[in-house]
Amino acid sequence: LYEDEDGIIWVGTDGGGLNRLEPKSNRFTHYPNTYGYKVASITRYNERELLMYFFSKGLYLFDKRTGNLRSFTLLNDRRNEEIIHSGISVNVDYFDTDKINLFADKIYTYDKSTGSFTIAHVADSSRYYGTVQRFYSDKDITYLFGRNYILRLDHAENAAVCLLAFGSKAVINAACRDDEGNFWIGTDKGLFHYDVNTQALNEIKTNMFRE
């Protein structure tokens, strides 16, 4: 799901392509030329276009007015093809003016103003593998979660460090950052709260769910 600056909600489906929901009118629009595509992630590209990743197909720019698609190459043709056929998804995030993070086998940043890519340094990267998902970002930092860890990406330094790792104790399914800057983490072992300042991790006892 992605909500654009006009309040339109873009709904990516697993094989049904892209859909548009206008909340004020409850009007729902399907784009037939995207049917059959598995939409893995969506973000802003500019006022007119969205950037999205279709699983095993690649990155595409989608024109919100015409519904037309055009391909977008990640880094270069060779690397782009390798990622498409790797079986991983690329998660995309427009985090600042003309800058987009692309989370794949590595953390890539695309600068639209220069048309260039950079790759973030991840401390002890051999321990933190697999696709990561963004759960908070602003112009300075992005927080990401992987299978059993949380990373903090510093945009100025173009480097990421691990803030928290569960190891084999739990698998992270979801995470969010609250208004106080702390994390709520949903895992296969229950709900946890992480205090960023004290680095205290506490399990939240609840009977709302088992996982």
Place the predicted regions along the sequence by residue.
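Carboxylate-rich, polar loop motifs that coordinate divalent cations or form catalytic acidic clusters
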Residues: L1-E211
